[in-house]
Amino acid sequence: MFSCKKTDSYPDNNEKLLRILDDKIKNKKYYEIKKKNHIQKLKKEALLYKNNDSISYHLNNLIVEEYLGYQCDSAYIYSDKNKEIANRSNNEIWLYKNLLQRSVLLSTTGLFVESKEILDKINPEVLPKQLRFSYNSAYECLYSNLLDYSGGDSPYNKIYKNKLADYYNSAYKALKPGDPFYYLFLSHKNRIENNWSQAEQNVNKFLKTTLPGTRLHAIGSFCKAVIDAKLGNIDSQESCLIYSAISDIESSTKENRSMQDLAS
């Protein structure tokens, strides 16, 4: 198990971690097969329960989440199935959940206009309370991807950053302290406000709740690497980028931003 945490000898530790990363890269196919087998298992379960809307919706939702960051085109198929189930069942919560998940899929694949159209049609005042975080998180995903796509010189950067600050603030407030995502989004908010020391404390709290080898651990480790860079902790930054890259490979996540930063 590999986790982004402090060590007394970063240079030596980083050399070991890079060797582990090289080994993971060589065995990338193994993790992809493991991922595919897990998705196939979920698909078989979904077929078994195709006449049970509740279980079928839940399994389709899991399949979409597994495909997210891995093979988004396939995720749309199961998103469509859940839209059909939600409409047939006249289940408002399922329909909202499907719309929010769909918006994230769209913004992740660069379809920003379509993603925003979905979110703009949702009235947050009538949204079920348990979906408030997902709503703000979907907007955060949209503006975060827009910010990355636009690049550092875009005249829209300030607008996107202001929007991000709003949705970071709304997202963490929709959760209770103790929820893992509370600390992740509070850390994002700290970063926007240039409160980097507090951002580090909160992302560390989030990382403690994630399992190495998962997409969430990769995200948390990458966020910590960004914070370490701002704080001047260069060796720790490299460690966290390596941990993030390892978790990306083990979870078969295709985004690989940490790998790109390590190569630059």
Give names to the regions the model predicted.
Residues 1-264:
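A "functional boundary" signal
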